[in-house]
Swiss-Prot record:
Presence of keyword Nucleus: no
InterPro entries named in the record: NadA (IPR003473), NadA_sf (IPR036094), Quinolinate_synth_A_type3 (IPR023515)
Residues that, per the record, bind [4Fe-4S] cluster: C108, C228, C318
Species assigned in the record: Listeria monocytogenes serotype 4b (strain CLIP80459)
Cofactor note: Binds 1 [4Fe-4S] cluster per subunit.
Cofactor(s) needed for function: [4Fe-4S] cluster
Pathway membership, UniProt: Cofactor biosynthesis; NAD(+) biosynthesis; quinolinate from iminoaspartate: step 1/1
Protein name per the record: Quinolinate synthase
Function: Catalyzes the condensation of iminoaspartate with dihydroxyacetone phosphate to form quinolinate.
Residues given in the record as iminosuccinate binding sites: H44, S61, Y139, I140, N141, S160, H254, P255, E256, T271
GO cellular component terms listed in the entry, alphabetical order: cytosol
UniProt cross-references to PANTHER family, sorted A to Z: QUINOLINATE SYNTHASE, CHLOROPLASTIC (PTHR30573:SF0), QUINOLINATE SYNTHETASE A (PTHR30573)
NCBIfam families on file: nadA, PRK09375.2-1, PRK09375.2-4
């Protein structure tokens, strides 16, 4: 889903924005009770605090994919996340289940950095350079079309929770991997597995060319030149400031951060790992967290016995995740209550066929 194509697609009536918080909470609570098991609301960790209390499940991308695959009861799945997550939920659920996204503008800039036409142009060039020695691996933060291509070519999806296991498996299948769309997760994972940086190349989808100065025979990992616009804003300078001003503070970051940041942090991991590690830490411990602002704020609220700050004090929330708010959730639920279909996410059968192969490989390995 291209964000530029959907920037003016918000058709929610204005009266929802004029309701009080209390009115909206009461209505959402009422509709949830009426729909019962026919409604399921999965919610990503990066969602707004006003939405999270209504979630039936909260988690990272892997957890939500697993939950979607297991849920067979709910007719309506209202996904509080972004577009690629709702696509994944649609593909993993039955044809009778309906997946909706409260605001169609909730996309992902990283996912949009890997266009299927760019990938189909890249693949034959890479085959010419390396022959049949490459396994494609896509971060779950990608479009259904990208997942489908990867699945059709024997590859798999991956999340930040299972990246080490999945990439290790992938490198056992072929001599090298093509990791997309997030170069940083790919680089950090491969480095953790012992692959030196000089054996990693960059694929530039704009120029449609490989960026690599070494011997091609040494290249083990090809990284698509994409990134997370949120995690790019955590810098080495942020870490230096914490070390200087708060030397006791433990720094934990998401692996979508740059390699330089991850290398200097005390630890890195998925949103699930970050939440679990801080929740289980001893009272009085101090933390600087390098991930999305909504989640950091929630961790602070849930751990009043610890000192927790954002690694970057000027960090903003993920703006597309932030599209999902209480008015849009209520608007969506009222449509379901009235028998109307709105903002359904539906992936076509051909795309689903091969994307499921990539997703199922990941879930089996996880």
């Amino acid at each position: 889903m291209n964000l530029l194509e959907t920037v003016e697609q918000d058709t929610m009536p204005t009266h929802y924005k004029q309701m009080t918080q209390a009115e909206m909470i009461a209505r959402v609570t009422e509709i949830k009770a009426q729909l019962g098991e026919n409604l399921f609301i999965p919610c990503h960790h990066y969602q707004k605090d006003e939405v999270v209390p209504f979630a039936d499940a909260i988690g990272d991308s892997l957890q939500l994919a697993q939950i979607a695959a297991q849920n067979k009861k709910a007719k309506h799945i209202v996904f509080c996340g972004v577009h690629f997550m709702a696509e994944t939920a649609d593909m993993l659920t039955t044809s009778e289940q309906i997946v909706t996204l409260p605001d169609m503008r909730a996309g992902c800039s990283m996912a949009d950095m890997a266009d299927i036409h760019q990938l189909t142009n890249a693949w034959p060039k890479l085959q010419t350079l390396f022959g049949d020695t490459i396994l494609p691996v896509t971060y779950i933060n990608s479009t259904a079309a990208i997942k489908s291509f990867v699945g059709e070519h024997g590859g798999t999806t991956v999340t930040s929770s299972n990246a080490t296991k999945i990439v290790s498996w992938a490198l056992e299948q072929k001599e090298r991997i093509f990791f997309l769309p997030d170069q940083h997760l790919g680089r950090n994972t491969a480095f953790e597995l012992g692959i030196p940086l000089e054996h990693m190349a960059i694929w530039n989808p704009i120029k449609n060319e490989l960026e690599y100065e070494g011997n091609l025979d040494d290249c083990k990992v090809i990284l698509w030149k994409g990134y997370c616009s949120v995690h790019q804003h955590f810098t080495v300078k942020n870490i230096e400031n914490i070390r200087k001003n708060n030397p006791k503070m433990r720094i934990i970051v998401h692996p979508e951060c740059t390699h330089e940041v991850v290398s200097l942090a005390d630890d890195s991991g998925s949103t699930k790992k970050i939440v679990t590690e801080i929740n289980n830490a001893a009272p009085g411990t101090e933390w600087a967290v390098g991930t999305e602002a909504n989640l950091v704020g929630r961790i602070i609220q849930e751990n009043p016995d610890k000192k927790i700050v954002s690694l970057n004090p000027f960090m903003c929330p993920c703006m597309t995740m932030n599209r999902i708010d209480l008015p849009h959730l209520l608007w969506t639920l009222e449509a379901i209550q009235n028998g109307e279909q709105r903002n359904q996410i539906k992936v076509d059968k051909q795309t689903t066929k091969f994307a499921l192969k990539a997703l199922e490989r990941m879930l089996q390995l996880s």
